[in-house]
């Protein structure tokens, strides 16, 4: 299963309402093209207020029909590594952190293994759940993406001090990455309907 991480920007307005409306208007076309919406995520920290991430999953290419005021800043395809093993929309309110890693392609599998070893202790210690760890869909991926759900920003801050086993694995993982960029977001909806649950 391929995940698309699409960064959209409204060039005329400072917030996300028009972006949400545009995605809402594309929801049936997205499904007709063989994709489901994993989530639409707006800024908390690190993303501009007039930008959102649209995350979909499917095996085909995807084209959106957007108004002239909205720009597709980036559209990148990623493949799951050790998570997710099943594919369903995000649904829990809270904080979703997109942590972008620059990596050497030769370290992708080891990074995935270290992450999987750390997560059980990490998740049992905090109100958090790893949504997925992805590698860019290329022969030699140089970018990985970790999406983690936290109940709130307080939990995210507390999770910086994980149990020893998780800490050790995270430190080993950190040494394998070239840099990391965390972006905190929240799950958005439109017209009172959760965009990720139109079934």
Show where each model-derived region lies.
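Surface-exposed interaction/gating patches
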Residues: 2-13, 82-153, 192-197
């Amino acid at each position: 299963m391929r995940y698309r991480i699409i960064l959209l920007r409204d060039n005329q307005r400072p917030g996300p309402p028009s972006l949400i409306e545009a995605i809402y208007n594309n929801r049936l076309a997205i499904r007709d093209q063989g994709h489901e919406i994993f989530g639409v995520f707006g800024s908390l920290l690190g993303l501009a207020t007039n930008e959102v991430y649209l995350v979909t999953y499917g095996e085909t290419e995807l084209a959106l029909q957007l108004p002239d005021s909205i720009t597709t800043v980036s559209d990148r395809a990623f493949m799951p590594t050790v998570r997710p093993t099943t594919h369903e929309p995000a649904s829990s309110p809270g904080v979703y952190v997109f942590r972008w890693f620059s990596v050497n392609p030769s370290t992708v599998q080891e990074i995935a293994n270290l992450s999987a070893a750390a997560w059980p202790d990490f998740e049992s210690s905090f109100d958090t759940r790893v949504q997925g760890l992805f590698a860019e869909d290329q022969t030699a991926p140089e970018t990985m993406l970790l999406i983690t759900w936290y109940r709130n920003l307080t939990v995210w801050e507390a999770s910086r001090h994980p149990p020893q086993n998780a800490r050790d694995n995270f430190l080993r993982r950190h040494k394998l990455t070239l840099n990391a960029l965390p972006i905190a977001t929240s799950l958005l909806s439109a017209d009172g309907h959760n965009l990720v649950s139109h079934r």
